[in-house]
Amino acid sequence: MGVFHIVVGLGNPGQEYEKTRHNIGWRVVEELVKRQNLSFKIDKKAKSKVAFKEKLVFVLPLTYMNLSGQALSYLLQKEKCSSKDILVILDDISLPLGKLRFRPKGSSGGHKGLESIIEELHTEDIPRLRLGIGPLPEGEQLADYVLKPFLEEEKDKVEEMILKAIQFFECLQKEGIEIALNKLSA
């Protein structure tokens, strides 16, 4: 089995949010599921869309971003996992567009979805893959910016970042954390 048991893509449900900056984590998990010819089912108790592959669970919380922890709390109990068995994939305004950063634990960094997960699970020991969507343009409000779609001229970089995130996850599961981190920083 790979490094992680539960892979969560943070985002907001609904078509109006599909292509927004805030939903980049959601898009990565959707693509991971699609590439493995899996499909999502709704798990009402988990308040999520879930897809299973052997001992791996892909999760898209159907709560809005700020309540993402509710979905994970239930799934951790159901799957008998600890917070260290989760990989949360999320957007990060403090990273430049296209940059990826893995952290095994830490604060929410102001990200409301991650903050909800930390609060619900009562720990900061939650591995996460942060995907750069920044920087925040001068004069722009954060809430407005993250809920906007990417600009046309950013789309190639976004697709490249999604691909890098998928490659990182696949390497992580097959070859382990050390090799995946080396490839990520290369």
UniProtKB/Swiss-Prot annotation:
GO molecular function: peptidyl-tRNA hydrolase activity; tRNA binding
This protein's UniProt keywords: Cytoplasm, Hydrolase, RNA-binding, tRNA-binding
GO cellular component: cytoplasm
Record-marked site positions (Discriminates between blocked and unblocked aminoacyl-tRNA): N12
Predominant localisation class: cytoplasm
A GO biological-process term: rescue of stalled ribosome
Active-site annotation: H22 (proton acceptor)
Protein name: Peptidyl-tRNA hydrolase
Organism: Methylacidiphilum infernorum (isolate V4) (Methylokorus infernorum (strain V4))
